[in-house]
Amino acid sequence: MALKNFNPTTPSQRQLVIVDRSGLYKGKPVKSLTEGLSSKGGRNNLGRITVRFQGGGHKRTYRLVDFKRRKFDVEGTVERLEYDPNRTAFIALITYADGEQAYILAPQRLAAGDKVIASDKAVDVKPGNAMPLQYVPVGSIVHNVELKPGKGGQVARSAGAYVQLVGRDAGMAILRLSSGEQRLVHGTCLATVGAVSNSDHGNINDGKAGRSRWRGKRPHVRGVVMNPVDHPHGGGEGRTSGGRHPVSPWGKPTKGKRTRSNKSTDKFIMRSRHQKKK
């Protein structure tokens, strides 16, 4: 899908760049595949802010997207592509041969009327088809990749995202992630062929603060403009640099400080994303 620019009738319209969604379905989602979604405003069950700068925004309905793709060897037809306010990618409504319907992440170059299938065996390498990594040809681009067999896709699910299968080793697949990390994943984990739709998402410009508010994003206030009671960088006479290495409001180093401590999965990372690109 292309990008849309607007006549500069106001400063906001001059800067506004959005994705042209004219090719998407304009009606309501399938009711049996939706759930209610209450706005949390960044608060937990005690009513305390656990995520700053969230709140407000347009009311949403949650679409139940099938990340597991466990309906094996039943061909599905793409009914339509839809907008989903809960994610950056578009979603596709699939109607299976037995009449069941499901939403899946829409890959690039998938259109209404196309056929898709998921299997625990090898299937055609075409966008939307899902199969275990052990059957995917080396060099292929995939998305919605499982990290644990049967858990459902966790990697490469946002707009334009993909992972490349670069090799195999002793029942494991070697994946190159978009961060540059190379990672081992078990060959029985499912992946869907292709890259995720809406790759133009990275080029949009909201044009005005209000459009961020419609999305439920509140102003992101910098620590250096706060008072000392509110942030370690706060206070000082006039504009200051913060006076120390950047820290979070709770005094923890931020902006590049490594926090990964999951030793149990270290063995699956063949190449760190921090290693210099050769």
From Swiss-Prot:
One GO cellular component term noted in the UniProt record for this chain: large ribosomal subunit
Alphabetic keyword roster: Ribonucleoprotein, Ribosomal protein, RNA-binding, rRNA-binding
UniProt KW rRNA-binding keyword: yes
Cited InterPro entries: NA-bd_OB-fold, Rib_uL2_dom2, Ribosomal_uL2, Ribosomal_uL2_bac/org-type, Ribosomal_uL2_C, Ribosomal_uL2_CS, Ribosomal_uL2_dom3, Ribosomal_uL2_RNA-bd_dom
Pfam families membership: Ribosomal_L2, Ribosomal_L2_C
GO molecular function, one term: transferase activity
Statement: the UniProt record of this protein carries the keyword RNA-binding: yes
GO biological processes: cytoplasmic translation
Annotated Basic residues bias: 210-221
Domain of life: Bacteria
SUPFAM superfamilies registered for this protein in UniProt: Nucleic acid-binding proteins, Translation proteins SH3-like domain
Region (Disordered): 201-278
Family affiliation: Belongs to the universal ribosomal protein uL2 family.
Family matches, as NCBIfam families: rplB_bact
Subunit structure, interactors included: Part of the 50S ribosomal subunit. Forms a bridge to the 30S subunit in the 70S ribosome.
Function statement: One of the primary rRNA binding proteins. Required for association of the 30S and 50S subunits to form the 70S ribosome, for tRNA binding and peptide bond formation. It has been suggested to have peptidyltransferase activity; this is somewhat controversial. Makes several contacts with the 16S rRNA in the 70S ribosome.
Protein name: Large ribosomal subunit protein uL2
Taxonomic path: Bacteria, Pseudomonadati, Pseudomonadota, Alphaproteobacteria, Hyphomicrobiales
Encoding gene, per UniProt annotation: rplB
